[in-house]
From Swiss-Prot:
Pfam family membership, one: AdoHcyase
Source lineage: Bacteria, Pseudomonadati, Spirochaetota, Spirochaetia, Leptospirales
Enzyme Commission number(s) of this protein: 3.13.2.1
InterPro entries on file: Adenosylhomocyst_ase-like_sf (IPR042172), Adenosylhomocysteinase-like (IPR000043), Ado_hCys_hydrolase_NAD-bd (IPR015878), NAD(P)-bd_dom_sf (IPR036291), S-Ado-L-homoCys_hydrolase_CS (IPR020082)
SS bond list: none
Cofactor(s) this protein cannot do without: NAD(+)
A GO term for molecular function: adenosylhomocysteinase activity
Binding note for cofactor: Binds 1 NAD(+) per subunit.
Name assigned to this protein: Adenosylhomocysteinase
Gene name tied to this protein: ahcY
Length: 436
């Protein structure tokens, strides 16, 4: 499939519209596990706080994202959507959204050319452009800044989902190139400390096991990076009985890893001995071609950071004498001239979405509730140019919306106790500088 033309009136492009009913049934299941989004639908029922909003969205087109999209439309927004990764789309989810009449341009296994074509389609709302951006990774934001700068004057705000995209926002701001106020959704406590940590704790092992059927117990695994994603990834592998080793550049994160019982080494210290390597840094060139050549025969290599730059895939694919054989979609065996081979998952892209279905619905409800609140805040209030985080009371609100489903009963302060702590009786309970 190859698509290169602009089609301003195209309403959708998905792999198979006949999968819409399957997608719809899974969306209904997911709604039961996404109490935050469903609570916002109920809270704003009939109020339409996003009426008039034209949201260009670029975020993994999964079942959980379908619940987000339909929440945005129920709150009054007009939405056009693409995925932020060539492998992360769940085709039945995309089909269900297309069937519901919401413009979506996404399918699993896009080429790079098709990926950018899909992003282009999110920008056209008839003869108008978007007035809001909802992004994951920063590609849509960068695309509009670089290719359609004239549209930026109409855009009220950007909400960015992930660590990599947030880094890009701060870089643009520092260089004076960011032209639209933005919300850093990733650094909401109820996003980074839940999605990044608890989501990866469940979805990393799911992706590796679906792809390879490998038994993790007893294996030696290397996790590169011990931020929130790395912490969740290390726990994911350890919980299945793997012996986990961590690499880090940050002495604080390295000390945390050591205090959690992980050995902290450098890649070159251990690469020849490990069975599984996971990159989780958001950086470039973490695993080089030289590292791959040194890996054990049959070792598994994957990435759970946003982009495919953490592993030197281009060098691997262009190395003379190296052969590539597809075992199944997103599972490739690379054989070196000496006869040794390694297994690379999802072409070095997000393994949990490329080889499985990503994070569970409940934790994505936390993240996406933040997204909706950020969109409402940016659309209805004029912000000066800058990068903001959601205020503490909204962060606490997101958490509170998810407690009942888990059977949580919160202790309530009395006025004397609140006065003693110096906090409002109903919160916020922590200062902005508090580190959870």
């Amino acid at each position: 499939m190859s698509v290169t033309t602009q089609e301003k009136d195209l309403s959708y492009k998905v792999k198979d519209l006949s999968q819409a009913e399957w997608g719809r049934q899974e969306i209904i299941l997911a709604e039961k596990e996404m109490p935050g989004l469903m609570a916002l639908r109920q809270e704003y029922k009939g109020k339409k706080p996003l009426a008039g909003a034209r949201i260009a969205g670029s975020l993994h087109m999964t079942i959980q994202t379908a619940v987000l999209i339909e929440t945005l439309t129920e709150l009054g927004a007009e939405v056009r959507w693409s995925s932020c990764n060539i492998f992360s789309t769940q085709d039945h989810a995309a089909a269900a959204i297309a069937k519901a009449g919401i413009p979506v341009f996404a399918w699993k296994g896009e080429t790079e050319e098709e990926y950018w074509w899909c992003i282009e389609q999110t920008i056209f709302f008839g003869d108008k452009g978007p007035n809001m951006i909802l992004d994951d990774g920063g590609d849509l934001t960068a695309y509009i800044h670089e290719k359609y700068p004239k549209l930026l004057s109409e855009i009220r705000g950007i909400s960015e989902e992930t660590t990599t995209g947030v880094k890009s926002l701060y870089k643009l701001l520092k260089k004076g190139e960011l032209k639209v106020p933005a919300f850093n959704v990733n650094d909401s406590v109820t996003k980074s400390k839940f999605d990044n940590l608890y989501g990866c704790r469940e979805s990393l092992a799911d992706g590796i096991k679906r792809a390879t059927d490998v038994m993790l117990a007893g294996k030696v695994a290397l996790v590169c990076g011990f931020g929130d994603v790395g912490k969740g990834s290390a726990a994911s592998l350890r919980n299945f009985g793997a012996r986990v080793i961590v690499t880090e550049i940050d002495p604080i994160c390295a000390l945390q890893a050591s205090m959690e019982g992980y050995q902290v080494l450098r890649v070159e210290d251990i690469i020849e001995q490990v069975d599984i390597v996971v990159t989780a840094t958001g950086n470039d060139d973490i695993i080089t071609l030289e590292h791959m050549k040194a890996m054990k025969d049959g070792a598994i290599l994957c990435n759970i950071g946003h982009f495919d730059t953490e592993i030197q895939m281009s060098r691997l694919n262009n190395e003379k004498g190296v052969t590539k054989k597809e075992i199944k979609p997103q599972v490739d065996k690379y054989t070196f001239p000496d006869g040794k081979s390694i297994i690379v998952l999802a072409e070095g892209r997000l393994v949990n979405l490329g080889c499985a279905t990503g994070h569970p619905s409940f934790v994505m409800s936390c993240s996406f509730t933040n997204q909706v609140l950020a969109q409402i805040e940016l659309y209805n209030n004029k912000y000066e140019l800058g990068v903001y985080t959601l205020p503490k009371h909204l962060d606490e609100k997101v958490a509170a919306l998810h407690l009942e489903q888990l059977g949580v009963r919160l202790t309530k302060l009395n006025q004397k106790q609140a006065d003693y702590l110096g906090v409002p009786i109903n919160g916020p309970f922590k200062p902005d500088h508090y580190r959870y």
